[in-house]
Amino acid sequence: MAKEDVIEMQGTVLDTLPNTMFRVELENGHVVVAHISGKMRKNYIRILTGDKVTVEMTPYDLSKGRIVFRAR
């Protein structure tokens, strides 16, 4: 996926799912399922329910995403 093709949105983690998947509610009200990006996984970034995160989504499937940043 090319970097210019992604849609970045802010959201809040609603629920933790198996296999490091998370249910995230975006600012516009949509709920997506997102996984952790490789760099966050490598650096052991912990994500908990209620955290504010940045989610990257592809325009081809807007129901799935990748968590690329966790706000402090």
Swiss-Prot record:
InterPro entries: NA-bd_OB-fold (IPR012340), RNA-binding_domain_S1_IF1 (IPR006196), S1_domain (IPR003029), TIF_IF1 (IPR004368). SMART domains: S1. It holds the Pfam family eIF-1a. One of its GO terms (molecular function) is ribosome binding. One of the essential components for the initiation of protein synthesis. Stabilizes the binding of IF-2 and IF-3 on the 30S subunit to which N-formylmethionyl-tRNA(fMet) subsequently binds. Helps modulate mRNA selection, yielding the 30S pre-initiation complex (PIC). Upon addition of the 50S ribosomal subunit IF-1, IF-2 and IF-3 are released leaving the mature 70S translation initiation complex. Disulfide bonds: none annotated. Belongs to the IF-1 family. Its main location: cytoplasm. The keyword Cytoplasm applies. Keywords: Cytoplasm, Initiation factor, Protein biosynthesis, RNA-binding, rRNA-binding. It is found in: Cytoplasm. NCBIfam families: infA. It comes from the Bacteria. This is Translation initiation factor IF-1. Component of the 30S ribosomal translation pre-initiation complex which assembles on the 30S ribosome in the order IF-2 and IF-3, IF-1 and N-formylmethionyl-tRNA(fMet); mRNA recruitment can occur at any time during PIC assembly. Residues 1-72 form the S1-like domain. GO terms for cellular component: cytosol.
